[in-house]
Amino acid sequence: NLLIPIAGRGKRFIDAGYKVPKQFIRIGKKQLIDISIDCFDINDCNLIFVVRDDQISNFNIDKMLKLKYGEDITIVVSDGMTDGSVSSCLLAEEHINNNIPLFIHTLDIEFAPVVHPKQICQSDSDGLLLTFKSNSSNYSYALLDGENNVIRTAEKKVISDQACVGIYYFKTGKLFCENAKEMIERNIRTNNEFYISPLYNILIEKNLTIKTKSVEKMHIFGTPKEFEFYKNNVVKKIGDKPIGLCSDHSGVKTKEKFKKILKSQSIDFIDYGTTLDNDCDYKYFIEQAITGKKDG
């Protein structure tokens, strides 16, 4: 099961003047939903989308999703806004196979490497969260013990340096549905909403094992400000091609500093090495380096 709730209103994008649902904002040849879902291997997944009724009447979002992902996907329609991601996901309960694993993908992100769900399903954990390092209170967080087990999660509160990407794994669909209902019955809310990450605290109370898996590269575009930064500083300047670096011996230190900056911004690069020849033809040097990489 791969469950993708996109029933939120996206108020900040509406207020910023965007006319289409944020998942369908386009950057070049791709829409934001493409960028996010491309980070997850959806082959052999039971794809379930949760959308709002007005997204269908105003934007034909159901037809767009079927054009992208096939006629056999499941589209669950909400009559309006829900009380949060957990409530939205529970609308799809009858379509979730209770006996197989469930992944929830909340979009608005680009990360690497690509998630292969079969690999995660081979773990012994009852649940798993993808994480990245951060200290911003905009995100949810997982606190780990000395054996890398999650002992607590929190929404919009920094309790560790392990922020949640927005990919959530439950060992079975039943495990999610039963505990999601309990969360709502106990009225466990953050900012008056039912978020997914605090749901894991209920599983932890029951002595179930929750793990994390870190991603190497992470970009977020869940708010207009984050989207503009992504568009103008990641995609526009770099696109799909990595930066190539090379230097003579006098520029080694500068090159290494630049590599640290690129790494800190999760920007891909290729280090073509260093030449001892001050009069080097760099175009020829890089061509030879590329040829060597292709051959080897």
List each model region and its residues.
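N-terminal small/polar loop signature for handling phosphorylated ligands or for N-terminal nucleophile
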Residues: C280-G296
